[in-house]
Amino acid sequence: LHRELLAQAREGSHRFLRLIDEAVSGQGWEVSYHRDSAEERLKSAKRNGKALFHMYDPYHDNALTYRLVYYMPFWQIEKSAKRWEWDVAQAQFDPSEIDKAEARQFHRFWSQRLFGEAVADVTKEGFVYVPLQGRLLDHRSFQAMSPAEMVLATVEQEPDLPIVLTFHPKETYTADEMTTLDEEICAAYPRVVIGEQDWLTYLAECDYLVTQNSSAALAAMFFRKPSVLFGQIDFHHICGNVYDVGAEEAYRQVKAGGQKFKAYLKWFLQDNTINAGKDDVHQQILD
């Protein structure tokens, strides 16, 4: 664990780590905490026991990793640090198996809890929202193409609507990246603009969203907005997935509509995570 998380774990103030401790201690295991250094992760393979990493790849047979599933109190314990390799990513979503009343209740409660008044006035103002992430010129292994190429593909697949890009607040963009955006994309295609409003405003007002694998696409489901994905991720099931079906089909699926947002959010977050707020959380952890 990193320094702050390690201190919280040892003092018992981190709820999920405390719940893990309680669950495994109840089975007779002794729990110890260590820094998340490369040295300690290597040592974990030689210890007589199991290891649980925070977000790092569990590289040996006796290791797992845990990670927040976007929103508290939803967590996952998995055999891979890559979200698109998680069990839920490989599972099949069948909306007919989800209770409609429970799905509506889940959507109503969590929409308000997570986004408050932002979800009160959802419209379609006739534009595509593209929340950029990092490394705009790189085509990484989990991506169908680079983020810059993704924007150009959107220009091709969406010939009419304005396309609003936003920058990730935690990313730093290079001069080459900015030149590509300004000169090769925005100047060449005036429909493509850099947005300056709050991202929740764009979620509430866009027709649909395009991204590599930003969690904004999951958030968009609370606003009942569909997304085109160019990267692999765990919440891909009701999105237009370019990585799997190609750009033309992915955009066609999104524009066709009919996505079961309420059923999906209940299935993805409630039925396929460890919910730290549930009474049976210790058994969920052990399972």
For each of these PLM feature ranges, what is it?
Residues 47-50, 64, 125, 161, ...:
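Short, well-ordered alpha-helix to beta-strand connector turns
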Residues 80-125, 239-287:
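Leloir-type glycosyltransferase catalytic cores
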Residues 1-4, 55-57, 71, 125-137, ...:
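Short loop/turn segments at strand-loop or loop-helix junctions that form parts
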Residues 10-20, 143-157, 177-182:
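Well-ordered, non-membrane alpha-helical segments in soluble/globular domains
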Residues 1-110:
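Secretory-pathway glycan-assembly enzymes, especially type II membrane glycosyltransferases
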Residues 44-45, 121, 201-205:
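Structural alpha-helical scaffold elements that stabilize or flank donor/cofactor-binding regions
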Residues 152-194:
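Catalytic donor nucleotide-activated moiety binding site of glycosyltransferases and closely related
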Residues 196-241:
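A donor-sugar binding/catalytic signature common to diverse glycosyltransferases
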